[in-house]
Structure formats: structure tokens, C-alpha cells
């Protein structure tokens, strides 16, 4: 708890207001105690956490099968969380080519139920340094291409998909 508070306080002291707090690779879901701290601090600061609504058993089962220890206690904590919650959370799927990655992304988005979904991605410029720090460099370069691709923009428009951010989500929550 001390570390999480220290990080948020440092950012606020530097003159920034975080739009949300993130679990980074789901680490705060690693134990009920971590999650309790994560959600408590989010509510105290009024900064939304990327918390997932687990009231839909299909969603909870998906994350259990993905290795997250979603005990009844965790589901109950999420139910009591008062700030906005995600209906689903995913990352841009990999592909063996740019076109395949784009098809996989379209398939993922098409499979989603209406609601608030966070899809993480790591857009990157191809550099020698990037190639030395991650084996997923090609996926990241394609992700940068993906979100400037006119076909992706058209797909979003044709399917009524609204791109938003945590500040807008929080504003809608307050209204």
C-alpha cells in the first residue's frame, strides 16, 4: 500500500493528475490483498483503476482460465468497487503478418459484447534498440501501423465503435 500511494503522490506532487491506475500485467490481481489495496486507493483518490466487472460469470470464467485467481472474495470486492469498471479487458492479438494481425484484431473486436472494453497495445517505432529489448518488437511495430490504418478507422466507424479514454469514462460516470 505504501508503494502504491507513494507512486500516485509523486505524480500528483509533480503537477499531474493520473487518468487512471493500472495493474501492469495484472499484478494487482495476483492476490486478494493486493487487489483490496488497489481498489481502495483508487476510490480514495477518485482515480479509476482498470478494474473488471466480474458479475458476468462468462467474463469471470475467462479470466480464471487465463490464470487469474478470482476467488469469491475477489468477485465480491469488484462488485463493491464504486468507480467505473470495464466489461472486458484484452490485448491486441498477435499475427504472423501485418494483415493477419489486423484480421485477428477485427475478429477480437467483433466478438465483444457492447460495453466498455480496454484493449491494450504497445505501438512502437522499429529501431535497433527496440529489437534488443523485446522479442515482440515486430508485433509492436505492426500495432503502431494498425491504429493509423484507414481500414481500421473505417472498421470502427462501420461498427459503431467509440474510442474513449479514462478521463471521458470518469466524466460520464460523474454525470
Where are these regions (language model features)?
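Active-site beta-loop-alpha junctions enriched in small/polar residues
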Residues: 24-26, 54-57, 88-93, 122-126, ...
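C-terminal domain-boundary segment and adjacent tail
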Residues: 49-50, 133-175
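Conserved, mostly hydrophobic/aromatic
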Residues: 21, 119, 156
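Glycine-rich anion/phosphate-binding loops
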Residues: 1-5
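Catalytic grooves of carbohydrate-active enzymes
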Residues: 14, 100-133
Amino acid at each position: 500500500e505504501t508503494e502504491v500511494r507513494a507512486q500516485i503522490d509523486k505524480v500528483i506532487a509533480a503537477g499531474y493528475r493520473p487518468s487512471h491506475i493500472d495493474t501492469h500485467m495484472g499484478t494487482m490481481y495476483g492476490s486478494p490483498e493486493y487487489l483490496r489495496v488497489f481498489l481502495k486507493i483508487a476510490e480514495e483518490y477518485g482515480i479509476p483503476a482498470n478494474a473488471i466487472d466480474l458479475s458476468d460469470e462468462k467474463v469471470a470464467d475467462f479470466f480464471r482460465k487465463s490464470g487469474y485467481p478470482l476467488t469469491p472474495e475477489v468477485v465480491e470486492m469488484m462488485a463493491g468497487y464504486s468507480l467505473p469498471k470495464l466489461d472486458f479487458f484484452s490485448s491486441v492479438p498477435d499475427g504472423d503478418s501485418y494483415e493477419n494481425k489486423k484480421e485477428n484484431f477485427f475478429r477480437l473486436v467483433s466478438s465483444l459484447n457492447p460495453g466498455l472494453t480496454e484493449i491494450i497495445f504497445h505501438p512502437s517505432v522499429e529501431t535497433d534498440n527496440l529489437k534488443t529489448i523485446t522479442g515482440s518488437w515486430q508485433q509492436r511495430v505492426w500495432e503502431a501501423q494498425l491504429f493509423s490504418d484507414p481500414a481500421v478507422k473505417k472498421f470502427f466507424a462501420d461498427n459503431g465503435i467509440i474510442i474513449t479514454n479514462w478521463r471521458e469514462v470518469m466524466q460520464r460516470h460523474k454525470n
